[in-house]
Amino acid sequence: MTDWKPIPRPSPSKSHRMLTLLGPRHRYCDGIGRRSFLQIGGLACAGGFTLADIARAEAVAASAGRKLPWKSVIMVYLSGGLPHQDTFDLKPHAPKEIRGELNPIATNVPGIEISELLPQLAQCADKYSLIRSVVGQRDEHSSFQSVTGYTMDETKRDGRPSFGSMIARVQGPTDPLTPPFIDLFPTMQHRPYNSPNAGSLGASFNPVKADGEDIASMRLRYIEAQQFGRRRDLLEQLDAFRTAADRVGAMSQNYQRAFDVLASSKLVEALDVEKEDPLVRARYGKGSAKHLGDGGPLWNDQLLMARRLVEVGVRVVTVAYGFWDTHGNNFGHLKQHLPTFDTGLSALIEDLSARGLDQDVLVVVWGEFGRTPKINKDAGRDHWAPVQTALIAGGGVKTGQVIGSTDASAGYAATRPVHYRDVLATIYQNVGIDPHQFVRDANDRPIPILPEDARPVRELF
């Protein structure tokens, strides 16, 4: 596969078209049909700002003619737990009941092999590192360990915040018009998959949510693209929405912030992947916004949206991607869905590199655990907490390497065990935050970001 370059975005069309902020209808396993919509939730960066303040801030930013540098993170959470031995840590010499149906293929880095179902990722292996020895997880179906660095019990008991909320708390926004943390997780049927919020830091550090059911949030079905051409039109429209909200008593602090965020047309445009060059969007592929099982959608627009968001200054974007809880028909499931994953993730990695963003945007891809070495009677792999693989790209880290290894059955770490908290420590260090510092929560209590034994993965720096 040849290298590809980002294509300049076309100038906005003068033709009349609609900007859709409401996703397609999808149906959950419980049979309830729901719509995904743009939900602007708790937002720290715009708290207390009026629409006039936002407009003035935008004018100042425009006159400055530049933007400050920042570090961003895109985390792709693989809900359900990806089978590592069928994707990034194959064991072709193991017995058939362990190695399964898939074969390894060479990558563009000598000595590194991955699954035959990931040919595009194989051709950009020089742009990421694989940690094949991630340990320390509990057997719990939740995003909490991946997103907070703590177990679900610890997170709920102690109010541990999402790493995105912690980064928002410590570093704040890159500018007053841009939220520091946007969570693209949909509302998944299995509730522990859903992203935890700011916890003890307080609701003001909750992410902007791109899906949800909060009645007091903004729900916009369509906004005419041409309305964004004139600033006054947008402000008048938002003021009309505010007046209507006041009448029904729905004007909470978070609702106020929703209007402030929407006053920034650059954020709205970043969320509109229709504005991307068609060739770039085609490279990402599409997938579907429909949820898989009780997990996330296999929807590559999320990955493209994440890149567009970090470009406009969002510090953290979290994505829930696919459903990998393959207790049965593991190989049929992977043959159907890994090609879409391969297309989307390789596009994100290559796109960031081609745009020169690979030094500033860290990409972390992992689930809550791995899968069992031995294939079960239903041709599936069950939960396996002892080890999994994480993929790390961008952020200026060292790439084209494998860190750690597993035993002959991919069941346990054989060399260089990396605790999952070390991955979170790596994220914090990469964005310039000491993972062991204390911050003040909403009650002015000092809380540690991570335990003292969490250490950044040294091989990446």
Language-model-derived ranges and their functions:
Residues 2-4, 11-461:
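Ligand-binding pockets and gating/stacking loops
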